[in-house]
């Protein structure tokens, strides 16, 4: 066993830990606004809006400038590269504006999924090349955390051992590079909801993947107190004939996390995985009411589940800005309560119950 060669000073560790704790402070979660230009195209298509840089700026400005009620609900915002360099109508860069609200600025740094040869349609994630230099630049440009998504899918033959090992190593490598630059890495090993597998199978696979990932993070000397985990909730496959209760989903999820995620990790920020807005809030709420001990904050890092109703209300029309912001604030408040186990389902919004599932989801 070789000696450790510490690559982080106590001050660097403190900075990372402070950032992570700020993002998942009580009642706070993450607004994932890091959809790629291609993903925004799909969202805008659904509201008959042209996918131009200006329309993307206007839409994200609506989210970032929602009134003070949203303030205490959001701990961090994940940006897409383009958005990082856009400005508000008042001429402030988006990162400056977001920071002025006390929200931490984050950036998606992966370059998307690519096929993994010799597997049954499995993938790995690219983007490690040049990441060291990009992190240095992003830190200068105001980013304090980052996100990297890996994708695994459940079939009778997958995820394979190769796919698990490869993706976990990529996540660990990314995490250690971020930490060298004072950036908190969010590690996202998403297990897709596609398939007809039951809840037990998802739980089993989630446990195996998370165990492998934390082993890889340890092998790469990643400082866990300065990381966050962005996992899928443990749900059955979308085509599974059996429908499980929110309580069953919460118990399966918290059990899987308790078996694999070290208590040193400050927070777990769930992805919504195509659940409806309401479902994503209810499941998060029930997890925070779960009778099992939870040593980490359980909160949200939602994209569609914070934005779907807002996007619909906006419809690409300048006059609908206020209505869109109201819908966004409604979801932000709901999830802020849910991550404290205090949410009472309302079910009043038309779009909130719509399923947001997209098969084989790629950002």
Curated annotation (Swiss-Prot):
Report whether Chaperone shows up as a keyword of the record.
Answer: no
Name the active site residues: 188 (proton acceptor), 230 (schiff-base intermediate with dihydroxyacetone-p)
> Which of UniProt's keywords are assigned here?
Allergen, Glycolysis, Lyase, Schiff base
- Please give the pathway this protein is involved in: Carbohydrate degradation; glycolysis; D-glyceraldehyde 3-phosphate and glycerone phosphate from D-glucose: step 4/4
As its record notes, the protein acts as a catalyst of: beta-D-fructose 1,6-bisphosphate = D-glyceraldehyde 3-phosphate + dihydroxyacetone phosphate
Q: What else is known?
A: In vertebrates, three forms of this ubiquitous glycolytic enzyme are found, aldolase A in muscle, aldolase B in liver and aldolase C in brain.
**Oligomer status and interactors:** Tetramer.
Give the UniProt family note: Belongs to the class I fructose-bisphosphate aldolase family.
The entry's protein name is Fructose-bisphosphate aldolase A
Q: Which organism is it from?
A: Salmo salar (Atlantic salmon)
Taxonomy, top ranks, is: Eukaryota, Metazoa, Chordata, Craniata, Vertebrata
């Amino acid at each position: 066993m070789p000696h450790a060669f510490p690559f982080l000073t106590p001050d660097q560790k403190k900075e990372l830990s402070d950032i992570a704790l700020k993002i998942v402070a009580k009642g706070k979660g993450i607004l994932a606004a890091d959809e790629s230009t291609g993903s925004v195209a799909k969202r805008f298509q659904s509201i008959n809006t042209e996918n131009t840089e200006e329309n993307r700026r206007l839409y994200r400005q609506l989210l970032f400038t929602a009134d003070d009620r949203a303030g205490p609900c959001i701990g961090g915002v994940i940006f897409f590269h383009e958005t990082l360099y856009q400005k508000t109508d008042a001429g402030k860069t988006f990162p400056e504006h977001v920071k002025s609200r006390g929200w931490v600025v984050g950036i998606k740094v992966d370059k998307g999924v690519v096929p993994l040869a010799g597997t049954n349609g499995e993938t790995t994630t690219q983007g490690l090349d040049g990441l060291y230099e990009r992190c240095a630049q992003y830190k200068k440009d105001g980013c304090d955390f980052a996100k990297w998504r890996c994708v695994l899918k459940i079939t009778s033959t997958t995820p394979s051992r190769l796919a698990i090992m490869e993706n976990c190593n990529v996540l660990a490598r990314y995490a250690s590079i971020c930490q060298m630059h004072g950036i908190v890495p969010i590690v996202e090993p998403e297990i897709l909801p596609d398939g007809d597998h039951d809840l037990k199978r998802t739980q089993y696979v989630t446990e195996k993947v998370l165990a492998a990932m934390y082993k890889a993070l340890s092998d790469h000397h990643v400082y866990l107190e300065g990381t966050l985990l962005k996992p899928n909730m443990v749900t059955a496959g979308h085509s599974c004939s059996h429908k499980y209760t929110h309580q069953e989903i919460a118990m399966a999820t918290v059990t899987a996390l308790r078996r694999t995620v070290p208590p040193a990790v400050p927070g777990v920020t769930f992805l919504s995985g195509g659940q409806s807005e309401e479902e994503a809030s209810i499941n998060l709420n029930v997890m925070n009411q779960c009778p099992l001990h939870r040593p980490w904050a359980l909160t949200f890092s939602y994209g569609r589940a914070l934005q779907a109703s807002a996007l619909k209300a906006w419809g690409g029309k300048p006059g609908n800005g206020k209505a869109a912001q109201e819908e966004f604030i409604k979801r932000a408040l709901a999830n802020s309560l849910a991550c404290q186990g205090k949410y009472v389902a309302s079910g009043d919004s038309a779009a909130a119950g719509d399923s947001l599932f997209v098969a084989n989801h790629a950002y």
